[in-house]
Amino acid sequence: MEKDTSIPEDLKLAVLEKIKPTEAERKILTAVQEELAAEVKAAAEKLCVADIFVKMVGSAARGTWLSGTHDIDVFISFPEETSREELERRGMEIAREVAKKAEHAEDRHAEHPYLNIVFKGFDVDLVPCFRVESACQLKSAVDRTPFHNEFVKTHIKGREDDVLLMKQFMRGGGVYGSELKTQGFSGYLTELLIIHYGSFENTVKAACLWKPGKKIDIMQHSEMEHTEPLVMVDPTDPKRNVAAALSLDKFCMFMDHCREFMKSPGLNFFFPPPLSPLEDREFLEKLESRKSSQLAIVFKTPDIVDDVLYPQLYKMEQAAAALLHEYDFSVIKTGVWSGKPETVVMLELISGTLPNVKKRIGPPVWVREHAEKFKAKYEGAENVFGGYIEGGKYVFEIQRKYPTAKGLLENQLLNCSLGKQVKSSVSAGFEVIEDAEICRLKDPDFRVFLRKWV
């Protein structure tokens, strides 16, 4: 693809000036990486663990990290024949030995345990893995990361600046990050896009024309069909889609971001102005102008990692909306926000109240057996306003069980399908507040969320 020259060179240079690590930053990073590698080797020797390799992976090892980010991924590589139990036990022993010199340490768990530490100001993951022959013969999901590292390092040379530009551009568009909270583009996916298209400009131009189902297979070795919006076949594993975590909405948000940028390139696409928290007065004005009903389900945030929490929150969000639909409330939109100590599921409805009367339509009168059963059920029953025939069918006007959305959620939310930890937290206590009452929620981050919401 021809290089697109419509993006001003001085704009790219201005962005790089802000995001490209300085030589001093690089030297500090390299020194810390070398020190960490030495600490891991010393810990393994002290604990009599033989045949350990230390591998630096991730953007810091590939030269595609943004200035100001202090993340280092250290993989502690064990021989392939090591048992999983031994890898986890001995790997964590080594990690904890290294952590003795850290400012902070925290056990984390993906497919198997790893240790997150703060070491000389850097956020460091110490991850045990198996040293397998190829990314197609994995013993655990993290085993593929060193292969990603080698592929990118051998193909990205000379295009590191393009990766930096793309990462910051995606950040500006709110689509960077493959964690389940964001459902956006991972760093590895971003690097592969640059490798495939050749530059930042070419990638932006190409993305303007994408459609769901777009497939990119750099090595031309795909073995499987995928149904995700974007399919980036992993160059190291033909069965894997690197873009599997990317949601349809984030895929489309990126396309829109690219199109708007190409119309009028500017720094604001990389560095959008920060949003201020929404003031009470502004929220009340929005309530008055929108004339809708706003509900907030508030409960204590479960003490679990985001990648476990957010799928459960999205499940709860969908379950709450489905419950409201089932009882005739019209949902305009839903959203979730989570902080410490509270989590909020937001719902906007056309109206939070419905009439006390509800129309129940039965079968045609001539379908005798079913029609008579329907009539017998409602005729003369309590909470029935009256009955008649309309359009050849029995109709009864009955009293609505839940005329308010708030009452419905308070009484039926716990009967919905909720994730394990979220259900436990909601069961311990939740509150449904509506409209002006939402002003009680003062967390500044929530108020920024609220500004986007309204």
UniProtKB/Swiss-Prot annotation:
Its cofactor is Mg(2+). ATP binds at residues 59, 62, 148, 167, 176. It comes from the Archaea. It catalyses: a tRNA precursor + 2 CTP + ATP = a tRNA with a 3' CCA end + 3 diphosphate; a tRNA with a 3' CCA end + 2 CTP + ATP = a tRNA with a 3' CCACCA end + 3 diphosphate. GO terms for biological process: RNA repair; tRNA 3'-terminal CCA addition. Pfam families: CAA_C (PF21133), NTP_transf_2 (PF01909), tRNA_NucTransf2 (PF09249). GO terms for molecular function: ATP binding; CCA tRNA nucleotidyltransferase activity; magnesium ion binding; tRNA binding. Mg(2+) binds at residues 71, 73, 125. Keywords: ATP-binding, Magnesium, Metal-binding, Nucleotide-binding, Nucleotidyltransferase, RNA repair, RNA-binding, Transferase, tRNA processing. Its EC number is 2.7.7.72. CTP binds at residues 59, 62, 148, 167, 176. PANTHER family: CCA-ADDING ENZYME. A single active site specifically recognizes both ATP and CTP and is responsible for their addition. Homodimer. Belongs to the tRNA nucleotidyltransferase/poly(A) polymerase family. Archaeal CCA-adding enzyme subfamily. Catalyzes the addition and repair of the essential 3'-terminal CCA sequence in tRNAs without using a nucleic acid template. Adds these three nucleotides in the order of C, C, and A to the tRNA nucleotide-73, using CTP and ATP as substrates and producing inorganic pyrophosphate. tRNA 3'-terminal CCA addition is required both for tRNA processing and repair. Also involved in tRNA surveillance by mediating tandem CCA addition to generate a CCACCA at the 3' terminus of unstable tRNAs. While stable tRNAs receive only 3'-terminal CCA, unstable tRNAs are marked with CCACCA and rapidly degraded. This is CCA-adding enzyme. It comes from Methanosarcina acetivorans (strain ATCC 35395 / DSM 2834 / JCM 12185 / C2A).
